[in-house]
């Protein structure tokens, strides 16, 4: 499945569980992240490694030369971002980035990063997450779909009560899940439990995941509607 398919599927999977524009960006970031193990390694991944590695290195220097300037939060942030890019850098295509382990790990980091940046602006935080997994060409294309999803949200005007870091993590989870589901529908399948198992999820398992997602979506919207009555 190409970027367009993953973008559309990411929006579909994310919409039932989000209620704001920044969450659209986060869902799209999750939907596009797994394919950082592919052709964009030379572009997006290496750029991310240089930036995050620079943040970590500068903080280490500050720690040894002037501890008063050392920023623990910035250091941790740099390490987390570095980990996000190291996974696809050392992964084969449809390797570690296409697993449930990576889904949980990366979603937590991207969501937490957005949560920490939300003091500036929640929309800015979501957009930064999307920028981390795209280049200027892909970002321009994806934003067209993001604006459409934004319009749909404006019409539906949902009120899903999720707060704190979870508010930023969940959209990434559902976006990421959409990517794995999309790839189960292809002949190559997905080794979602790699490296513990090489068993491939294919269409049958993909349909099961879609059914689970649909049940969760129905439950969330049923709860939301009942809370309004």
UniProtKB/Swiss-Prot annotation:
Compartments where found: Cell membrane
Keywords for this protein: Cell membrane, Membrane, Transmembrane, Transmembrane helix
Record-level GO cellular component terms: plasma membrane
Pfam families, per database record: YdjM
Keyword presence, Cell membrane: yes
InterPro entries noted in UniProt: YdjM-like
Chain segments annotated as transmembrane: 8-28, 49-69, 70-90, 113-133, 136-156, 162-182, 208-228
Keyword Membrane recorded: yes
Topology of this chain in the membrane: Multi-pass membrane protein
Protein name per Swiss-Prot or TrEMBL: Uncharacterized protein MJ0790
Source species of the chain: Methanocaldococcus jannaschii (strain ATCC 43067 / DSM 2661 / JAL-1 / JCM 10045 / NBRC 100440) (Methanococcus jannaschii)
